[in-house]
Amino acid sequence: MTTTAIDTPTGTAAAQRAQKPLTEGQQSKGTLIGLWAFVTLPFLALFAVIPVAWGGWLSGTDVAIFAVMYVVTGLGITVGYHRYLTHSSFKATRWLRVTLAVAGAMAVQGSPTQWVADHRRHHQYSDLEDDPHSPWRFGNSLKGLTKGMFHAHVGWLFARELSNRARFAPDLLADKDIQKVDKLFGLLSLTTAFAPAVVGGLVTWSWQGALTAFFWAGLIRIGLLHHVTWAINSVCHVYGERPFEMREGDKASNFWPLAILSFGESWHNLHHSDPTCARHGVLRGQIDISARVIWLFEKFGWATNVKWPKVERVKAKMIDRDAQPKLAR
């Protein structure tokens, strides 16, 4: 069975890429309008959660469709876009690579190539001037940090200039499968928003079932996953613990309350200390659902060369040199 790695070349190739501009082109007005719609409408829907549920417009069918869509698209981001496409934490079979890219696109957080370019840029300049979404961008005063938190959480999405894909994601630009998913991003965004309504309507054979499924598994699911993902950029660079060493200036932290909803992404301090590690919650007791999914992929033979944490490497990265870390199983 053929597996594929997403390579991030080093040496001469990396030096040549570093000479390319930081950004390329601008988002079109049409793109910005679509962005406003997919950011604003799910967010506004979140305010209607209690009255809609209280009014009896929530069924077991809605919950089931919501759960399936949240897990599939959430793992598309955490396992697919992030740990695989961005950081090459494992190699994947071709069908798994494409499936993960499609699932990530259906989270409506950007096309695979642009998402990866933004994130690799973030790691290269984490919490420095060229970081696309640092909460410390406007200083550490109350006013500056408040403005920075909004910028890191959602404001940066509306920046006109785009991270240069040729500089930060040349491997994906050369990947024909990923480029096909890029081109289908708009269609996949509409599909993920309205497919729940179709399923809900067919299961209940009613317009009400279609409407409530659209609300819960479409709007609410997209909105919740958006803000959980964005909280990694904002909250997890301000609040939480930092037991692992990072590059000077980097403020990535572990924020346990988001561990389950983010599928393990909120163990952000270790991730910035060791970006290619397939498990972010490396210590015992740290829930990392994404890592468990990768483990399952490995058991089925769909993922190989998984970069699992090792005690010696984890210990070497800990600030407390006397610590004796017990790794998660």
Enumerate the language-model features and the residues they cover.
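Non-catalytic, topology-defining segments of multipass membrane proteins
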Residues: 1-230, 235, 277-329
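Helix-loop boundary elements of multi-pass alpha-helical membrane proteins
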Residues: 89, 238-243
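Active-site-proximal inter-transmembrane loops
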Residues: 169-177, 241-267, 273
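Short leucine-rich amphipathic alpha-helical surface patches
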Residues: 239, 264-265, 271-272, 278, ...
